[in-house]
Design a protein with these regions (language model features):
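Extended lipid/amphipathic-ligand handling interfaces
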Residues: 85, 128-139
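Amphipathic hydrophobic-ligand
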Residues: 114-131
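Tubular lipid-binding modules of the TULIP superfamily
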Residues: 1-113, 142-216
Length: 216
């Protein structure tokens, strides 16, 4: 059977191409990976995103924090190796790995005049693995994009299970928000001499994301 099957056109992007696209996207927009409140980040910039402190009674100005992610890397089905349980990479899925560094501004006591003490950064770095799948958004021939939707997130080497559940949930929300900005436009998937009218896909097989359709 031909690659196009019952369709007139087939296009794909392989695992290396996806990772190159992620490198290019986040390399040009590092503020999608670096978030912090004052004093860690003082204003929005091309490299960082300012967020509000966490309000809490009795903590003047709120709890300061920062979250930094490394550029995610993908592994398209079939997997290059086994994932940590309970994660299993199935057909039409991809895994993403990143390192998340969470920093809290810890107030070290009070000064002699009773004012708030100095804020000291306390950080931890976590290895994060997620499983997701591609979805498409189509507007017109050749115009649209593929994005990623998460199915499950695991923070490795965390105990007890209750803390694992909290961190898994936290990182799933953060990664989902970050990935909602990532779009792989059709023009990096299809070829220059035709504009794809999307009819099927995206699917994942043979380490590539595949879409099918007609041509314009």
């Amino acid at each position: 059977m031909s690659l196009t099957g019952t369709h007139h056109a087939f296009a794909s992007i392989d695992e290396r191409g996806v990772n190159r696209a992620l490198q290019a996207f986040f390399g040009a927009r590092p503020h999608y990976l670096h978030y912090g409140s004052v004093p860690f980040v003082t204003s929005d910039s091309t490299t960082e995103t300012l967020v509000q402190t966490i309000a809490f009674p009795g903590v003047p100005g709120g709890i300061a924090y920062a979250i930094d992610l490394t550029i995610p890397t993908t592994d398209l089905y079939p997997p290059d190796g086994a994932l940590p349980p309970p994660l299993v990479l199935g057909p039409d899925q991809l895994s993403l790995t990143t390192e998340a560094t969470i920093t809290i501004g810890c107030t070290a006591g009070q000064s002699a005049d009773g004012k708030r003490g100095q804020v000291m950064p306390v950080s931890t770095s976590l290895d994060v693995i997620a499983i997701g799948h591609p979805v498409s958004v189509y507007f017109s021939p050749g115009v649209g994009y593929v994005r990623f939707q998460l199915d499950q997130v695991l923070v490795e080497n965390v105990a007890p299970p209750s803390l694992q559940a909290v961190l898994d949930c936290l990182l799933e929300m953060i990664l989902s928000a970050v990935l909602s900005s990532v779009e792989l436009p059709f023009n990096i998937i299809d070829v220059d001499f035709f504009k794809l009218i999307l009819e099927a896909g995206p699917t994942i097989a043979d380490n590539q994301i595949e879409i099918w359709g007609d041509v314009s």
